[in-house]
Amino acid sequence: MIKNIILVIIIVGAAILVYIYMKKDTGEMKNVEMLARKGMSVIGGDIAYFGNVRGFYAYPEKEGEYPGVVMIHEWWGLNDNIKDMAQELAKEGYRVLAVDLFGKVAATPDEARAQTAGLDQTKALENLKAATNFLRQAGAPKVASLGWCFGGRQSVELAISGVKLDATVVYYGSGLATTVDKLKPIKWPVLGIFGDKDQSIPTETVRAFELSLNTLGIKNEIYIYPGVGHAFANPSGMNYAPEETKDAWAKTLAFLKESMIK
């Protein structure tokens, strides 16, 4: 009897560990519970913005003129965590369109890696520009881009594509453009959030990015958090750092308010 009880405990324990591991690998855990603040009542739902491509659009319920933010997902795709973050940002008085660059959500890191590797960058930029136009047509007087990881790089790619923005936010986007020549098109403030243990974006690369922005006279805020690695703001990842995530989000809100509302 005791052996049977022990066996059941082992099986249940193993199942729990597998569940936790799967949750960490799929990007489906959320930040919104920790970052939630009292704010405006918002409306959110799926909407077509680029042909048949549907994103998630969140905006304040009260009518008004609100700035817009193009929100760009990580390599997982447009999952529930990103949709919740869109609603959380909308509470602060923004029209937020969380784009979909893949058309599906990856279930494993291998799937995420494959869909990122197969991205058509030209089409991705068309997608992002359509999102920018959507927000302007919705009445946003100013538009910013904000992305994490894969989306962080795409946030910068949009900024240097020739489209007019009013602010750019990048969370640890690997493969960043760092040269003066490539960053020349940017004419607005940039916020960069990074970790000094991020092997995919060495501190030297971040400093090169910052130096080029300074050389071009582009107002910028670059933060490198000590002791944290890549995707530290992703609650599904092994590198998740809650306190740094809260601080980075507070800095993001302050930056957007300064750049878009004041």
Language model feature labels by segment:
Residues 214-262:
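C-terminal catalytic histidine-bearing segment of alpha/beta-hydrolase fold enzymes
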Residues 197-201:
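Acidic catalytic loop of the alpha/beta-hydrolase fold
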